[in-house]
Amino acid sequence: MAKIYVDSKIYNVNESDNLLQACLSVGINIPYFCWHPLLGSLGACRQCAVTQYDNFQDRKGRLIMSCMTPVTDGAIISIKSTESEVFRSAIVELLLTNHPHDCPVCEEGGHCHLQDMTVMVKHSMRNYRFKKRTHKNQYLGPFIKHEMNRCIACYRCVRYYNEYADGVDFGVYGSNNNVYFGRIEDGVLESEHSGNLIELCPTGVFTDKTHSKKYNRKWDMQYAPGICHNCSVGCNISIGERYGEIRRIENRYHENINHYLICDLGRFGYSHTNLNTRPKKPTYVNKYNDLNVLNFNEAIKIGVDFFKRYKRVIGVGSARSSIENNFALQELVGKENFSNGMSNKEKECIKSILEFLKNNYIYIPSLKEIESYDVILVLGEDLTQTSSRVALAVRQAVKKKVQDIKNLYGIPKWNTSSNIHISEKFKNSLYIMHTHESKLDDISEWSYFASIDKQVNLASSIAYEIDKSSPKVSNLDSELKEKVLLISDRLISSKKTLIISGSHSFSDSIIKASINIAKAIKFRAPDHHVGVTLLTSSVNSLGAELLGGMSIESALDDLKKEKADAVIFMEYDLYRSVSEYDCEYFFKNKDNIITLDHQYTQTFKKSMLSLPSTNFTESSGTVINFEGRAQRFFQVYDPNFYDKSNCLCDSWKWLHTIKSKINNTEICWFNLDDVINSYAEKYSIFKQIKTNELNSNLRIHGQKISRSPIRSSGRTSLRSNIDVHEPCQPKDINTMFAFSMEGYNQPNSSVSNIPFAWFPGWNSPQAWNKFQVEVGRNLISGDSGIHIFKKYEKKTDVYSNIVLKNSIKEKYWNIIPYYHLFGNEELTQYSSIIQENTPLEYALIGLSDAIKMGLKKDSIVEFNCLKKDYCLPVQVSKYLTEKQIGLPIGRKGFPLALVGEKIEFL
């Protein structure tokens, strides 16, 4: 720590910071534009000027840029000196000479950093009376609106997009006072993280186009801390609502997960929550096939009669639903009748992952920690498409060597102006094994393209080369043997090694082979730091599997063999998992089927009793991410408040009410805390989830935490078009939040789940500075989430039961999955804007096969699989090996059951 003097006051600050960051960390406001905690310092805007003095006798001092000045012990500076105040005000005035006077119609108004800084420097009168420079705006795609005339040339956008995210289709053009930030020509931004430009831009150059369609100011929305449900990373998000619709999703700071960035799917893929076609009332199909709309009590009565009529009812849960909902279903049908909805293949993968996490003497890094590794090996995962935020972290890890070089020469971490020159020459090692090309190949030192079986063989060879107790592989060619020696040497000689794999290939063997490599490194060098990241396909795959249960194949088999009489699906679409033929056969009789869901899935439409449930924005619950971190998401609004005819309930409420009526007992789950207490008592692994911080009884100074900013307006007229009498605001009995602007909303050590970032004078996302102990580091309250797996010190043996297959010429075509960020995740497929931007379905075929068959791009291929005919255009891959065909697994018509199936004729 260093001691500095600021306007005659003494502060102890972090000596590794620059003066700007140090002052912000101790609560001193200095205006800035080009600096950002994520991007470091550039010194481009000259806005953060302060006066520095040589000693206490110096009365004149000199102007310095605080973002480019390192902290030195005993430094004497003034922020309030007349010279620095006049200078900062003049800089804002200069920046505004070409800035339009359009705050009232700008989407950034109300959470604009430029507005905040203008107020901070007390600039209120413009002296510029001449014509303003104007630019033509570009079309940047359906998600981001471009308004170049608002630009102040802070360079944040190009530094993030090109230097941080490695984007290549965005840049800066021009010179002097006439620069342009955009693409060479109109077009959709290619980066999967382009949406972060919206929050990083301090003005309104880049704004959320999806929000603009139904716009509200920041202070007029109701927020709740949420968890992104689109993959297993579990990024923290802030969800904004108005008039019963989700209007905007923003990044919610979490130091060890997403910090300042989320992917575009998490930011823009929410419109399925607003669909008017969503089920909102219970329905019942009688014996005459008539559809009847029910009220709550009628639906419960039919549900109770259903369970009394059938002896054994199978309950099928879902990995896209919370632990609470799955547990409620398990309690209703019994543990022996419960299925978590996973296929046999996926279940084996998740079991292996859980076994490893429970015995994790090998380190499990957080998303942020992935950025610190110097050698990374990725096996069987297309990270950019399946876990995009992990791919961005891997990109930072490859560039981490730049910081090592800077440390060698004493260049501070925050001084990023030299990064681009160093990074071209020095990079860390990334090795990838996959079936076909991925978007990380551009930074990979070596990519190996082969079938899953061959990937397992190569991974096992690496493990054997490191430690001879691993399974031995024979028949590797000489070129691959050289690569095995190279990679094994790099893995063992690095400072920190990371192995990444997961369940998206539906191969248990690739997961075990990945773990074997990590174990082999630990056996050979016990003090070597090695980490393992194992990704799953859904937000709560680990949570669902911890509850146990049979596979979906076993459940359907029991129903076909009449070992069970009926089934209840909870937020689960059978058509996504099982072949269409099997589904149609199964749904011939709908009398024995109940479905709960918040989307009109094909399964929901074919049920006897259909119960509408709340989605992740309308309910609260717990999910577990890939590292075993249990995280709570919170209800944003009450959907029944805006439309009293709605009959939407949390799935656990439907299920528990039915169970209570069947057993003629009193309802004992009155709120979410009661459900958590029940499963924490039954499953010891969940005991840590029961924490006082998340208890619904938590109060700060006697107040609940407000979901809305204090300036929220129009509450009394929200429903005036329906009824002029203002109804009572809904009461949230499940959480510590209030559906109101009345309550506590300031930084506090008791609350790590923050609905929105706001602080007096700080309305933009830069307000997160005020919620952190030190700017860019941990929150005052600490990170949210609880690691449920304890550190395990005892070493375990390598997997010796991996099936190693020799290379043989394939007779049939083998189906493998390919993924796209937009289109493969289940719920976002219902989102209209995601549908518009989903690539068309195609069959991916290797170049050698295409040449043999005389196929080229967009040629049509036909085949039959799982008793269904397919007709698809062809896309040709340079690297896909012979007799492999890639299909868009997870999309409508392409169930998970297709993976690994064989096609005889193509």
Swiss-Prot record:
Domain annotation 4Fe-4S His(Cys)3-ligated-type: ranges: 83-122
Residues noted as binding [4Fe-4S] cluster 3 in the record, renumbered to the chain: C228, C231, C235, C263
GO cellular component, one term: membrane
Reactions catalysed, as given in the entry: a quinone + NADH + 5 H(+)(in) = a quinol + NAD(+) + 4 H(+)(out)
EC numbers for this chain: 7.1.1.-
Keywords, ordered alphabetically: 2Fe-2S, 4Fe-4S, Iron, Iron-sulfur, Metal-binding, NAD, Quinone, Translocase
Residues reported in the UniProt entry to bind [4Fe-4S] cluster 2: C151, C154, C157, C201
Protein purpose: NDH-1 shuttles electrons from NADH, via FMN and iron-sulfur (Fe-S) centers, to quinones in the respiratory chain. Couples the redox reaction to proton translocation (for every two electrons transferred, four hydrogen ions are translocated across the cytoplasmic membrane), and thus conserves the redox energy in a proton gradient.
Protein name as catalogued: NADH-quinone oxidoreductase subunit G
Natural source organism: Buchnera aphidicola subsp. Acyrthosiphon pisum (strain APS)
